[in-house]
Regions:
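A non-catalytic structural micro-motif
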Residues: 29-38, 53-84, 97-104
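Short, solvent-exposed beta-strand/turn patches at coil↔beta or beta↔helix junctions
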Residues: 1-19, 40-45
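Extracytoplasmic/secreted proteins, especially bacterial periplasmic and envelope-associated proteins
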Residues: 13-20, 46, 50, 54-58, ...
């Protein structure tokens, strides 16, 4: 799920995907789901860690609103530390502004 620059509100395209996937997420039992917040390289490391956390928290709050049990969901922020795309342009940055779902 991707985010606009310097934003943590969930975009309408991401809301649509989460709404469609909510039933599958509700059925997910056993194990833990980790929502990893990520940012592009712009901004200070401290700012990006906080922004990544706000992104992960926003996704968890939206999942809760959809009726997904959040007791086994954790959030973590990696800020700019784990880019998906190593480039240094808007195309790469857009891919790096994301929340990644990881199941353990």
């Amino acid at each position: 799920m991707f985010f606009d620059y310097d934003k943590y509100d969930i975009r309408s395209d991401a809301r649509d995907v989460l709404q469609k996937d909510a039933s599958g997420l509700k059925a997910h039992s056993g194990g833990t789901m980790v929502l990893e917040g990520h940012c592009d390289e712009r901004g200070t490391p401290e700012y990006n860690l906080a922004l990544g956390q706000r992104r992960a928290d926003a996704v968890m709050a939206y999942l809760k609103d959809l009726g997904v049990e959040t007791g086994s969901i954790q959030t973590v922020s990696y800020g700019e530390e784990r880019p998906f795309d190593q480039g240094h342009d808007e195309s790469a940055w857009a891919k790096n502004r994301r929340v990644h779902f990881r199941f353990q």
